[in-house]
Amino acid sequence: MVAIGEKAPNLKLGKWVQGMETNFDKEGDNVKLVEVFQVNCPGCFMYSMPEIINIYQKYKGDGLTVFGVATAFEDYDKNTLENLEMLLTTGEVVGDTKQALSQYGQLDDGKLQFKIPYPVAMDSLVKETGEPSREKMTAFIKNQLPDFDSQPEDYKQQIFERVKTYFKSKEYSAETFEMYSLQGTPSTILVDRKGILRDV
């Protein structure tokens, strides 16, 4: 896991779906802004993505690189590579995104009213198998609860059991999403000209 103020490691990506393949180490001294979203995330398409598109259009030639990363930490049947490819080629959306955008009149014939103009990749998704290690659970907990070690033992055991249940329910680990300790979608990753993580 990377912290704000540290060197930003390259994103772990599965497949580039739109635009030229890139990563932090290939973008020189540009500021890097990464929009992390899920295909099945209404808020991503209603609020965050239009803002990121505006930023991209305003600053794309002025030392800012913008790209998108579609991830999946839930709804694995909807947040798929296939649905991302369909979204980027046809503008068609699925699931809760389709329902919400339709309800608010933000679709034209079931398709987005805008195109995503910047490069987009799919997060690297690793199939979960077996029991989560104590070390993995501890790292996850301490990222969420920094004062975990000072808590009573019975409370700590309850938290471990909840986290174990959570990890068992996960079908995949989304490597970029987890490496940057993102809490949900939409999220952004901001890296400065020197490659230092400035905000998530």
Where are these regions (language model features)?
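Short, P/G- and charge-enriched loop/turn segments at secondary-structure junctions
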Residues: 1, 106-108, 174-178
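A short, hydrophobic beta-strand/beta-hairpin element that forms part of a small beta-sheet core
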Residues: 11, 119-124, 140-144, 158, ...
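Short active-site neighborhood of thiol/selenol oxidoreductases, capturing the structured segment around
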Residues: 21-53, 65-70
